[in-house]
């Protein structure tokens, strides 16, 4: 499997879990925009694309308005060819609380975290090790994390990012304080 067809999950509006759906699909190179846009009941995406070592990009608008998605732990971890992330990839995720722990762990080809990546995710509480081991990461844009509702865990977010040269202003955005 090298690509996922557009609208692949559109008929699964009642699905609540996409854990390990494509985990280990080492030939998968591309995923379409708005892949989960109609999966409004999805609560967990844990390890959904983990170890997809040929995957090159996280597309724009991956989620629609999904107010129930809470767990994105390790969603793209160990995707060693992942080079780009669209700035609005996660803009629809706004559950009551949530975790993005290890979301891009060991994505060694990732060069930049785009400005405002998690800016619309005010209710996420756990960003532990989100970019740990991203050894190719050179730049982190401004206003990445929205901490308005009290992100409580940000341990090791950039641990082992040995190429990191630039971090933007206000990466831990808190617009309500």
Please give the residue ranges for each predicted region.
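Solvent-exposed loop and capping/linker segments of extracellular ligand-binding repeat ectodomains
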Residues: 1-177
């Amino acid at each position: 499997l090298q690509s996922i067809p557009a609208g692949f999950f559109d008929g699964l509006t009642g699905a609540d879990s996409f854990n390990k759906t494509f985990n280990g699909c080492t030939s998968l190179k591309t995923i379409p925009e708005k892949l989960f846009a109609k999966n409004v009941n999805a609560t967990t995406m844990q390890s959904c694309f983990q170890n997809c070592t040929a995957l090159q990009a996280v597309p724009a608008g991956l989620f629609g308005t999904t107010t129930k998605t809470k767990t994105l732990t390790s969603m793209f971890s160990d995707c060693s060819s992942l080079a780009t992330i669209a700035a609005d990839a996660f803009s629809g995720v706004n559950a009551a609380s949530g975790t993005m722990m290890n979301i891009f762990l060991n994505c060694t080809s990732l060069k930049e975290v785009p400005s405002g990546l998690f800016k619309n995710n005010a209710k996420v509480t756990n960003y532990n090790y989100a970019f740990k081991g991203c050894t190719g990461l050179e730049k982190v844009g401004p206003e990445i994390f929205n901490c308005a509702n009290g992100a409580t865990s940000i341990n090791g977010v950039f641990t082992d990012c040995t190429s990191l040269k630039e971090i933007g202003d206000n990466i831990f955005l808190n617009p309500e304080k």
